[in-house]
Amino acid sequence: MGNFKLTSSAFEDGGEIPRECGYKNGNEEPPLTISGIPEETASLALIMDDPDAMGAVGKVWVHWVVWNIIRDQDMLPNDDITPLYDSKITADVRCGMTDFDDTGYGGPAPPDKRHTYVFKLYALDSMLDLSKESTKADVEKAMEGHIIEQATLTGTYAP
C-alpha cells in the first residue's frame, strides 16, 4: 500500500489546470496517469469535484464521475504508469451525471474566483453495478466496503 498515485502530465499536484481543460475554454479532459495500482484491484473509479463551489453555489460541484475502469493486464503490463483513457479500456467504463446535467467530463468553471479541484481515484475490489445516469452519491454509496486504496490529485483554475 502507499504507491497508488494519480498524476497529470499537464499540471503538478496543486498546480494550475491548463486553460483548455476549462468548461468554457475547450473542455478537454486533462491527461491523467495512474501508477501503483494495488494487485487485488478489480476496477477503478474517478470523481472530480469542486469543494470551493460551496461558497458560490451552495454545494460541492461535481465535474466528472467515472467507474468500472478495468484493470487489464494488457493495458497495465507491469503496474507501471498508464494513461487513464487508453484505447484498450473496455466498454465497461461508465460516466455518470455531473452538475452540468450531462455525463462525461465537465471542466473547471469557477463563477467567482480561483477554485481548487479535487480528482479522487479509487481502487476497488469489485465492479460497480450502476446505470449511466448514476450520480456521485450513487457511486460513493456503491463503493462503500469496496475501496482498497485512494489516490488524490488537486489542481486550481481561475475564471
Q: Language-model features: where?
A:
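N-terminus-centered regions that define maturation/targeting leaders and the start
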Residues: 1-159
